[in-house]
Every structure is written in C-alpha cells, then in structure tokens.
Curated annotation (Swiss-Prot):
Forms a homohexamer that can probably bind six kinase subunits. It comes from Leishmania mexicana. This is Cyclin-dependent kinases regulatory subunit. One of its GO terms (biological process) is cell division. It comes from the Eukaryota.
Amino acid sequence: MPAKPAQDFFSLDANGQREALIIIKKLQCKILYSDKYYDDMFEYRHVILPKDLARLVPTSRLMSEMEWRQLGVQQSQGWVHYMIHKPEPHVLLFKRPRT
C-alpha cells in the first residue's frame, strides 16, 4: 500500500491544524529572514523555514499573505509569495514593488 502523502497545513482537519499550530509556535523563532535585495522593479527576500515547519507548506501552489502569516512568517505588509523553488521547498521566495 503506498504511503499517504503528507498534508499541508491548509488541507488538515481541525484537529490536525491544532496539532500543527503547536509545531508552528515552537519553531517560529527559528525562521530565518534574508536581507532584502533589489532589481529595477521589485525588492525581494527569501525566508528559510525549519524543515519540520516546511512540511506544512503547500507544494503545488503559492500562498496568500494570510496563509504564510498563519505558518508563522512575520514581515511587513505587501510581500507576495511569488515562486516555489522545488529543489528547496523550505525556502519561500517573496517580492514586492519598489517604492
């Protein structure tokens, strides 16, 4: 029988989400934030999640701001999760327009 694929946080039932919130609270202080870097149009940053927290990230779609905040990511408003980096799913890539 094939192994059941892991579910991301947003696919879990209420009990699963409660258990996941304990993990999120425990690991939130271990989230690493890059310095910002720029091109002509955008500023960028990447966020590195602990591997146990990264298991809760959806792998087939980008997250809304509300969703990545639920996973414990803390940054100012306006950042957009813009790309999934398949080789390193624990690295979240964000951008926002330059001001």
